């Protein structure tokens, strides 16, 4: 890559391909980290968006292909894989979700498989995809991050979508009055109407923080684990470029060991995100607080 020092190499790999308004007023791609920062809130991380859409299409294609090839006789390998995934998610929903909503299982399946695919890209050696993007564009200084879940914008986007569903179903099941009652009449209550009114601000503060903590914790948990995993891969890659045989050999061993362990992290983070989504939506469907 274009970065010459270890510090520059690491910073280069942690910078997204950013599109936004340049200092001269034109719209274009940032060529430095400073330019990307100056673009502000309305900048787009093109690599994050691109990989999210691409892997979403891959997910749909795989499951659509399996559905078209479904047979009543001996199933093929792809069909077996898809059936295992569907049964696993369906069992998780039945064990965790206590309401009645036919959309929860498809949503949980989408969340699990999509996030798993986004995480899975982290197993590709850190230089391969950025170098490929640089060769295709002819720009050796091109910023390019392939793991969308190491971008907090992606994980926040996912968690905010779940949060919107939580609020929507809370209001749909309990009504606007029931939803507001949950925020203002719990956890403290009193038979004295004056005391109850005085407790409303306290209850609202506590319940609002609890409500907002759901999407924030979802996003930061996924981002933090995947970002740390990517950073370790980058640090191991720095060892390869040290020019020292022992460090390079150690880097090979560490890379394989961390990749094997990281498979567990990749799967676990997708599973945790899915399960918490199911739990939060189950709570939204409960009539009582």
UniProtKB/Swiss-Prot annotation:
| Keyword terms, alphabetized | ATP synthesis, Cell inner membrane, Cell membrane, CF(0), Hydrogen ion transport, Ion transport, Membrane, Transmembrane, Transmembrane helix, Transport
Pfam families on file: ATP-synt_A
User: PANTHER family from the entry?
Assistant: ATP SYNTHASE SUBUNIT A, CHLOROPLASTIC
Spell out the protein name for this chain.
Answer: ATP synthase subunit a
Q: Which gene encodes it?
A: atpB
Which ranges does the record mark as transmembrane? 43-63, 104-124, 160-180, 193-213, 232-252, 259-279
How is this protein positioned relative to the membrane? Answer: Multi-pass membrane protein
Q: Which GO terms describe its molecular function?
A: proton-transporting ATP synthase activity, rotational mechanism
Q: Does the keyword Ion transport apply?
A: yes
Q: How does it assemble?
A: F-type ATPases have 2 components, CF(1) - the catalytic core - and CF(0) - the membrane proton channel. CF(1) has five subunits: alpha(3), beta(3), gamma(1), delta(1), epsilon(1). CF(0) has three main subunits: a(1), b(2) and c(9-12). The alpha and beta chains form an alternating ring which encloses part of the gamma chain. CF(1) is attached to CF(0) by a central stalk formed by the gamma and epsilon chains, while a peripheral stalk is formed by the delta and b chains.
Please describe what this protein does: Key component of the proton channel; it plays a direct role in the translocation of protons across the membrane.
Tagged with keyword DNA repair: no
Q: What is its main location?
A: membrane
Q: Which family does it belong to?
A: Belongs to the ATPase A chain family.
Please state where this protein is localized. Cell inner membrane
Q: Which GO terms describe its biological process?
A: proton motive force-driven plasma membrane ATP synthesis
User: GO CC terms on record?
Assistant: plasma membrane; proton-transporting ATP synthase complex
Q: Which organism is it from?
A: Pseudomonas aeruginosa (strain ATCC 15692 / DSM 22644 / CIP 104116 / JCM 14847 / LMG 12228 / 1C / PRS 101 / PAO1)
